[in-house]
Amino acid sequence: MTKRRVVVGMSGGVDSSVTAWLLKEQGYDVVGLFMKNWEDDDDGEYCSTRQDWIDVVSVADLIGIDVEAVNFAAEYKDRVFAEFLREYSAGRTPNPDVLCNAEIKFKAFLDHAMSLGAQTIATGHYARVRERDGRFELLKAFDHTKDQSYFLHRLNQAQLSKTMFPLGEIPKTRVREIAAQIGLPNAKKKDSTGICFIGERPFRDFLNRYLPTKPGPMKTPDGKTVGEHIGLAFYTFGQRKGIGLGGSKDGSGEPWFVAVKDIASNTLYVVQGHDHPWLRSRELVAGNVSWVAGEPPADGARCGAKTRYRQADAPCAFGRAAQAGDERFSLVFDEPQWAVTPGQSAVLYDGDVCLGGGIIESAATGRAGTAPAGRAPALVEAR
């Protein structure tokens, strides 16, 4: 009897390594595939591609599977990184990991896996897939503290039908235990953090390579200039660290936060206090939608939504655009949400089931009547 072939995306980390081992133990014909999505440059201090590949080969040798490497750097640059730069240039804050999953890990990788004779692919993501009534559902992981369905919401039914997430039913602590018990050489390797192509390098230094600095005034809601920013692209809504203000001499002494990026006047507006009304939104509008469930919720439906990773689901009402052909949607939250950021994803849930979502275009904050006279209306963050 021919074994069912599964190609596992292996990164050199513990999660994908345990995924490959679990599937091998379950009797699958497992092939490991290492994706190189970023060309190494002069950042040897930060790029770990070489060591990651060594770890993949070591793990594959231990568990007894074949492994190969494939270079998707060109596809990544065209489909993910170019969009990443466009969004930052426009003053928004994108999430490239969401786009990477949809365009690279579950498109380019899936296509390559099928060419290797695979019936299914698998990754080390913490999520679950369930088939029900001829459709495939994306569910949160059993371990909600590690759930990664937020990053997977742009997958479609075809991609989901060919995908396995073996770690979706397992707590992260158990994954580490398995890695140690079977003697994986990377059992104690730290989880990767940050944007995949940036790694551990300083984000601002990296971004400055591709986007020019364009200094401008940093102002308070009443129009007082309190400093100078280096370029709006280098700040994000709700940012606290790296603003360069500290406590204001004549202010409240509370921390400063980025509140508005005014593209027209190249002005960065900052406010003091985590609970400032300029940082909270009851409504948002999202576009560039994708429904992993196959279709959007009904107009007026109640659901939960995340506007950032690891955020608790926020109860809200879903609204479809009134104009025919407009696929955008609105969300009205029961309670104001903090730092709802254009460029990030608004992802909808019905309990554990991920419905899909879209890219946040705008969010209404408590700024009505408080804007300084003459301020341009082209506000990007929480406009």
Swiss-Prot record:
Enzyme Commission designation: 2.8.1.13
Region named Interaction with tRNA: 146-148, 308-309
Enzymatic reactions: S-sulfanyl-L-cysteinyl-[protein] + uridine(34) in tRNA + AH2 + ATP = 2-thiouridine(34) in tRNA + L-cysteinyl-[protein] + A + AMP + diphosphate + H(+)
Cellular component GO terms, alphabetical: cytoplasm
Enzyme class, first EC level, given as a word: transferase
Gene Ontology BP annotations: tRNA wobble position uridine thiolation
Binding positions (ATP): G9, M10, S11, G12, G13, V14, D15, S16, M35, G124
Keywords from the UniProt entry: ATP-binding, Cytoplasm, Disulfide bond, Nucleotide-binding, RNA-binding, Transferase, tRNA processing, tRNA-binding
UniProt xrefs under SUPFAM superfamilies: Adenine nucleotide alpha hydrolases-like
Location of the region described as Interaction with target base in tRNA in the Swiss-Prot/TrEMBL record: 95-97
InterPro entries to which the protein is assigned, alphabetical: MnmA-like, MnmA-like_C, MnmA-like_central, MnmA-like_central_sf, Rossmann-like_a/b/a_fold
Cysteines paired by S-S bonds: C100-C196
CDD domains: MnmA_TRMU-like
A GO molecular-function descriptor: tRNA binding
Domain of life: Bacteria
Marked site positions, Interaction with tRNA: H125, Q344
Active site residues according to the UniProt entry: C100, C196
Locations listed in the record: Cytoplasm
Principal localisation: cytoplasm
Assigned protein family: Belongs to the MnmA/TRMU family.
Function of the protein: Catalyzes the 2-thiolation of uridine at the wobble position (U34) of tRNA, leading to the formation of s(2)U34.
HAMAP family for this protein: tRNA_thiouridyl_MnmA
Protein name listed in UniProt: tRNA-specific 2-thiouridylase MnmA
The organism of origin for this protein: Burkholderia mallei (strain ATCC 23344)
